[in-house]
Amino acid sequence: MSLSIVHTRAALGVNAPPITVEVHISKGLPGLTMVGLPETTVKEARDRVRSAIINSGYEYPAKKITINLAPADLPKEGGRYDLPIAIALLAASEQLTANKLDEYELVGELALTGALRGVPGAISSATEAIKSGRKIIVAKDNEDEVGLINGEGCLIADHLQAVCAFLEGKHALERPKPTDAVSRALQHDLSDVIGQEQGKRGLEITAAGGHNLLLIGPPGTGKTMLASRINGLLPDLSNEEALESAAILSLVNAESVQKQWRQRPFRSPHHSASLTAMVGGGAIPGPGEISLAHNGVLFLDELPEFERRTLDALREPIESGQIHLSRTRAKITYPARFQLVAAMNPSPTGHYQGNHNRCTPEQTLRYLNRLSGPFLDRFDLSLEIPLPPPGILSKTVVPGESSATVKQRVMAARERQFKRQNKLNAWLDSPEIRQFCKLESEDAMWLEGTLIHLGLSIRAWQRLLKVARTIADIDQSDIITRQHLQEAVSYRAIDRLLIHLQKLLT
């Protein structure tokens, strides 16, 4: 037969829409025409496929060849279409007899020798293929990725000849070996931090409720050290979360997928990171740092040094848990539900009071004004991490609570939240806040008066209630008491700092 159809998958973000490769061989001048919105890398497939077919012992048809990648309105890029094009060519030229070709999907790049190479986004392609009821054949290079799925519908091959022999029923293909989580010893323990008890408490609340945290303090007080300990307090990823994170990571760094399997992402971009690097971008948009931090932590050190427009671009993803990237050739949505942890100095010199202060209140306010009010509103907790008191370093250090001990309380609090509302407190919307964060009338009036004094917004009111709800869950309390509210209000260091500076100016 001079016409053959092979199924494959594109890679558009974490989605893998189905693509049909149609090959027609007819009489006419020898040549190959490829249609269906192929990019340059796909057009180059004609040379790779030709050499791979010849070097695998087959004949390249010396006829007019037309290849259609359907649907035609979907942009296609990369070498992932090499294998399906080669198989479709061999089937159309009757060099390959495959009666069950419709039951399989093929994804892989071909070397000139006919060897198969891995492609980005193999996890998404395999997952979608299995959901559609077909089996998928991928390169052996992608074995570690598709092995995470533990699906019976994945097959791996290392050469075009092996795929052809399998489709003709002459040879069996291997299934990927299931991938287990790599066990790692905890490198950063909370007991390593000397003092800073309020900072440790704030970190516990942040981990328990999934909140966003801002650490403010002079240089060298342990802000970065505290932030790096948060992963030790968080639970391992569930199967669904692990596959989501692995699917995103496989688009940019497939080699790290197995190493980081089931581990919470912890992304710490440099403050010189561009807007595109942070939220994602490109002609066909790729994931940025906020998507790579999905289901994990995004840590921004030296917060005011980031470009203001880069930080303001995080405002919508923090609220919605996803980022919409619109470009001329593609519109892609990436998941971006992360915990934002940030650290900053209170002034350009690192201090805003005391003997070390070398800045006027105007200079300090100008420095803090690099951060917009709506962006600062997204932080549930802001803590001041002060200089350690004199003598604490010379005394014998008594280790504090370990990460394992604190993690037990975090897990118990999270269990209460999922049992009550099936989500973390940080993810509660307005109706759910009214339902699960009820206050006594006297406590509500006290909290409203406090917010008016601090000049906070309605969003800050809701975030304070969610933090108080988390504190109550840590205390195993069903109701939010005045004590819980007072502790939640105490974690508003940035507001107190701004009020202090305003008073100095008046």
Curated annotation (Swiss-Prot):
One of its GO terms (molecular function) is ATP hydrolysis activity. InterPro entries: AAA+_ATPase (IPR003593), CHLI-like (IPR045006), Mg_chelat-rel (IPR004482), Mg_chelat-rel_C (IPR025158), Mg_chelatse_chII-like_cat_dom (IPR000523), P-loop_NTPase (IPR027417), Ribosomal_Su5_D2-typ_SF (IPR020568), Ribsml_uS5_D2-typ_fold_subgr (IPR014721). Pfam families: ChlI (PF13541), Mg_chelatase (PF01078), Mg_chelatase_C (PF13335). Gene3D superfamilies: 3.30.230.10, P-loop containing nucleotide triphosphate hydrolases. SMART domains: AAA. Belongs to the Mg-chelatase subunits D/I family. ComM subfamily. NCBIfam families: PRK09862.1, YifB family Mg chelatase-like AAA ATPase. This is Uncharacterized protein YifB. The gene is yifB.
